[in-house]
């Protein structure tokens, strides 16, 4: 068994058993961003679940893009419930976009305007954050990236028709956990969400054949990064994320 497969199996086994890893076994840890993405794709293929969404955020340094697929079993309509057995219970307040057109992987480059013309709806989203490792934040960013950038679930609110992206960039996010309002950003913290989605669409051409052949599809939801950093819920927490003009999304830990 090769290193990529060993690493993918370790992440899957840790999730199934609800245990944490101190490190990747048998020297299988990713040594590059390319290997981290190969591990993501191997986990995806081994689990056999359909992609329903993607998360994408700005890169830094050698990590030119941070992104991960989110499978159909991890996407929930608000109001949603997650298990109290989740250890970290990290919470991010986000805005997500649903594509109305396929964006197949191709040699040409997708532009920001291509993305603008491909988006159907926009929605408030809550990302539930978990790690399969024993520390937070994960010390090695490549490990976090291989672990689907620490995604556990994506909860989406009511969708509204896509409108002026400049107005969306200037919205103010609010996150409330157990009636306590967290600090969130006014204005999109990750630059330009449409440019991020264009980077994601172009990134498909360098993924494994399993992902490359799929590309991005009409109906895919793309969430574009946190407006609050990461805050943390506790047992039986009730979480609400709000954006003016978009509405809200709700998550509860109680099952």
Region locations from a protein language model:
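Flexible glycine-rich active-site/ligand-binding loops centered on an Asp-His dyad
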Residues: 112-148, 182-195
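Generic secondary-structure signature for well-ordered alpha-helical cores
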Residues: 12-17, 45-49, 102, 120, ...
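A generic local secondary-structure boundary/capping motif
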Residues: 83-88, 141-145, 160-165, 230
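Short, structured patches in soluble enzyme cores that scaffold and shape functional sites
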Residues: 95, 99-101, 123-126, 130, ...
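Catalytic-pocket segment enriched in acidic/His residues
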Residues: 149, 154-255
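Conserved active-site and cofactor/substrate-binding residues in soluble primary-metabolism enzymes
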Residues: 2, 6, 31-39, 51, ...
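Extended, compositionally biased flexible segments
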Residues: 2-110
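Tryptophan-centered motif/residue detector
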Residues: 53-56, 133, 143, 154, ...
